[in-house]
Design a protein with these regions (language model features):
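Glycine-enriched, solvent-exposed interface loops adjoining structured elements
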Residues: 1-126, 139, 144, 149-194
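Short, exposed beta-strand/loop patches in secreted or surface proteins that constitute
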Residues: 129-139
Length: 194
């Protein structure tokens, strides 16, 4: 849901106990001092990113579909697939290939089980009954390495949803409605720490 930056600023002021009628807060005209509204505005994206990274999957679903093509390390449909992630990627919610029995367990490259994914033994690495998606960085950008498939060239991407990095665009920010008040509370906390 889209929320205007003015709405976030207003709700944060209420959270802080500072409203527009407080003349002491808006009478300061020092050019080297940030106004309360400027401080709040500078914290919105940071607070939104923190809240969305910590939120449970159910609070974020449904995500934004990943609309890129799979690349294969070896032959198509066999072994590891590479799914390039969008530039605004922040968090992967779900990914599933057509030969997998369920969505993948999502880990990052610093997870100890990442080294197991290169094992020559199918029971150790991700497989169609226990798929694993590893979020990592390539020179071309962020990718999800998908372990692994065995069905051949017919394998396709069935589902891939992600959470985009929240940004203020034209004075609006897109946030899940259930998390809005958590974002406002964190904006207020970050503003008080400034």
């Amino acid at each position: 849901m889209l929320f205007s930056q003015q709405q976030v600023i207003s709700d944060t002021r209420i959270w802080l106990g500072h409203n527009r009628e407080d003349r002491q807060l808006i009478a300061i005209e020092d050019p080297y001092t940030l106004s309360l509204d400027e401080l709040i505005l500078s914290k919105i994206e940071t607070a939104a990113q923190r809240v969305l990274m910590d939120a449970s999957w159910s609070m974020l679903a449904p995500g934004t579909p990943v609309r890129t093509r799979l690349a294969w390390r070896d032959s198509p449909g066999r072994g590891m697939a590479v799914l390039p992630l969008p530039d605004d990627f922040m968090r992967l919610l779900s990914v599933r290939l057509s030969d997998w029995q369920r969505p993948a367990r999502i880990i990052t490259a610093d997870n100890p089980s990442y080294c197991w994914q290169s094992s020559p033994f199918a029971g150790v690495r991700g497989n169609p009954s226990r798929p694993v998606a590893v979020i990592t960085s390539y020179p071309s950008g962020m990718v999800a390495e998908l372990y692994s498939s065995m069905a051949g060239p017919s394998v396709r991407l069935v589902e891939a949803q992600y959470v985009p990095c929240p940004r203020l665009i034209d004075g609006f920010i897109n946030l899940p409605e259930p998390l809005y008040h958590d974002v406002v509370a964190l904006v207020a906390q970050l503003t008080m720490q400034s």
